[in-house]
A protein has these predicted regions:
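Alpha-helical bundle regulatory/interaction domains
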Residues: 1-40, 44-204
Length: 204
């Protein structure tokens, strides 16, 4: 994934801009860590090793990340920003899921290692919350729709279901089908009211 993707320019919130800040450097760190974790567990990696493999200084690393465990959380936010967060804005449901998972599947070993650490629990807490906030913003600010109790329920359920379901996809032995098929199945699980409302992007 490149740092110069099709970004949602209509909502320049500080937290979104923060995700994009120094994106090229951060992506270099992600790629370096993914390579290192092919042979070395995350807990045994040092920041010095990561910096050497990334071609950056320690000061540059700490300007980008609080610690090595923050790298996975940033990458998830970065991928979501150009993928599922664009559903209903610039992408359909299928396009959003496919773009997101096509990026994540490149880093299966990286996320498998990161998920073994207790620090990963902060990601567990943040992903569903961020997805709910984004879906609410999309409905309200992009489609100009009112948020009914039913829609809020559907958003809550979908965010939880996405978070629990999507990681299973990367188990090719359990689900020996194409990514395209998995994305289609995911689309079929989206509550119909929510699906119909956001499947047509407002920006192309």
């Amino acid at each position: 994934m490149q740092a110069n993707g099709t970004w949602d320019k209509a909502l320049n919130k500080p937290e979104k801009l923060g995700i994009l800040s120094n994106a090229e450097t951060k992506l270099n760190v992600v790629n370096a860590m993914a390579d290192l974790m092919e042979t070395t567990p995350l807990e045994k990696l040092t920041v010095s090793q990561i910096c050497k493999a990334s071609g950056i200084s320690r000061s540059s690393f700490y300007r980008c990340f609080e610690d090595k465990y923050a790298v996975a959380q940033w990458h998830i936010q970065f991928v979501h920003l150009n993928g599922v967060d664009q559903i209903g804005r610039t992408l359909s449901w299928y396009e959003g899921y496919f773009r997101t998972e096509a990026d994540f599947v490149k880093y299966k070993r990286f996320y498998a290692g990161a998920s073994k650490k207790s620090d990963y629990n902060t990601i567990d807490e943040s992903i569903p919350r961020c997805r709910k906030e984004t879906l609410i913003e999309t409905i309200r600010d992009y489609h100009g729709k009112k948020l009914t109790t039913k829609l809020l329920f559907e958003i809550e359920a979908l965010a939880a279901m996405e978070f629990k379901t999507l990681p299973w996809w990367h188990d090719d032995a359990k689900y020996p089908v194409t990514l395209e098929q998995k994305c289609q199945w995911m689309c079929e699980l989206v509550p119909r009211d929510l699906f119909d409302m956001l499947n047509q992007p407002v920006i192309r």
